From Swiss-Prot:
This is Thiamine kinase. One of its GO terms (molecular function) is ATP binding. InterPro entries: Aminoglycoside_PTrfase (IPR002575), Kinase-like_dom_sf (IPR011009), Thiamine_kinase (IPR014093). NCBIfam families: PRK10271.1 (NF007620), ycfN_thiK (TIGR02721). Keywords: ATP-binding, Kinase, Nucleotide-binding, Transferase. Its EC number is 2.7.1.89. It comes from Escherichia coli O127:H6 (strain E2348/69 / EPEC). The keyword Cell division does not apply. Gene3D superfamilies: 3.90.1200.10. Pathway: Cofactor biosynthesis; thiamine diphosphate biosynthesis; thiamine phosphate from thiamine: step 1/1.
Length: 274
């Protein structure tokens, strides 16, 4: 249920107006982007979310609601309310583990997602790369960073192998192991893009695991594994730059030292993969 209002409301106003019988249970602070909180009434639970990035355009949060509204409940939480700066979605019972599931199981989930109707908006990385450069700490901007940005701008993004709806933040902390199977949470980066971009963006433990995931996906999608892996590799420079830039951007926003450490580690990976 989208509810349009130009006036922001507080958490207490949200609960008293729309969920008067519910009460807060706990706050989630997992992940790098921020937290949300859980409300409950007689065993029914919802997750109340706010935009992770306070500087992001408002349409980005609305897009997340629209994506969840069209996705099947077997892979994503169902949304119940959207209004300015707030979204309420189903709580997904299950276990969130610290490691990825079996690659074949994960490949099945991603392949099923990629068979769904497209969302209607494209994921384009170059505008994000340029935004992160512009919004980063000037003291952290380097000639090497600018050189890589110009190189990618000149090269342009790889031509999509197959265009599908993507989640774009697949890691262990965003996967719920439920009784009915794997489900994905945190859809704030969702959009339409190349299936190989999704596979390239999965937070894997090592190259062997990555290759196996791509091979398992290729089998389901009836694509030659070597062809799919080549396309995945084409996205690596873009994704490493995206991660490094995002960490730099979040460092300037929050001052949290973890983002500097993650940014430095990603810059080292870029040097290794040159």
């Amino acid at each position: 249920m989208p509810f349009r209002s130009n006036n922001p409301i507080t958490r207490d106003e949200l609960l008293s107006r729309f969920f008067p019988q519910f009460h807060p249970v706990t706050t989630f602070n997992s992940g790098l982007s921020g937290g949300s909180f859980l409300i409950e009434h007689q065993g029914q639970r919802f997750v109340v979310r706010q935009p992770h990035d306070p500087d992001a355009p408002r349409f980005a949060f609305l897009r997340q609601y629209r994506a969840l509204s069209q996705l099947p409940a077997c892979i994503a939480p169902k949304p119940h309310l959207y209004l300015r700066d707030w979204m309420v979605v189903d709580y997904l019972p299950g276990e969130v583990k610290t490691y990825l599931p079996d690659t074949n199981e994960l490949a099945g989930l991603l392949y099923y997602l990629h068979q769904q109707p497209r969302f209607g908006w494209r994921i384009t990385l170059l505008p994000l790369l340029e935004l992160y450069w512009q919004q980063s700490d000037p003291a952290r901007r380097t000639v090497g960073w600018l050189r890589r940005l110009k190189r990618l701008r000149k090269a342009r993004e790889p031509r999509p192998l197959r265009l599908s709806p993507l989640h774009m933040d697949v890691h262990a902390g965003n996967l719920v192991h439920s009784a009915s199977g794997l489900k994905l949470i945190d859809w704030e980066y969702a959009g339409d893009g190349d299936i190989a971009l999704e596979l390239a963006a999965v937070w894997v433990e090592n190259t062997d695991q990555h290759r196996q995931l791509v091979n398992d996906y290729a089998t389901r999608a009836k694509i030659y594994p070597a062809q799919l892996w080549r396309q995945v590799r084409r996205w690596f420079p873009w994704l490493l730059m995206l991660k490094a830039g995002w960490f730099e951007y979040r460092w300037r926003q929050t001052g949290d030292q973890q983002f500097i450490r993650l940014a430095d580690d990603t810059w080292r990976q870029l040097l290794i993969k040159q």
